[in-house]
């Protein structure tokens, strides 16, 4: 299933530059999956507030530190 989205010309040009022979879907999927990008996109599209993202980042950092402490024992 395909969907049509509207993006500004400058964003389109950026995607074209990094796309190479990949599809736009592949590029966008890769960008969303990279660490931190999903939350940034959620803020950009207004589905999460900056405060929610900061709270999520703090919680993620705490979990990462806890996991590292388990590995160091």
Curated annotation (Swiss-Prot):
Cited InterPro entries: Put_antitoxin
A Pfam family this chain is assigned to: VAPB_antitox
Leader sequence segment: none
Record keywords, A-Z: Toxin-antitoxin system
Keyword set includes Ubl conjugation: no
Protein's UniProt keywords contain Lyase: no
Chain's role: Possibly the antitoxin component of a type II toxin-antitoxin (TA) system. Its cognate toxin is VapC18 (Potential).
Record family assignment: Belongs to the UPF0330 family.
Protein name: Putative antitoxin VapB18
Organism from which the protein derives: Archaeoglobus fulgidus (strain ATCC 49558 / DSM 4304 / JCM 9628 / NBRC 100126 / VC-16)
Gene: vapB18
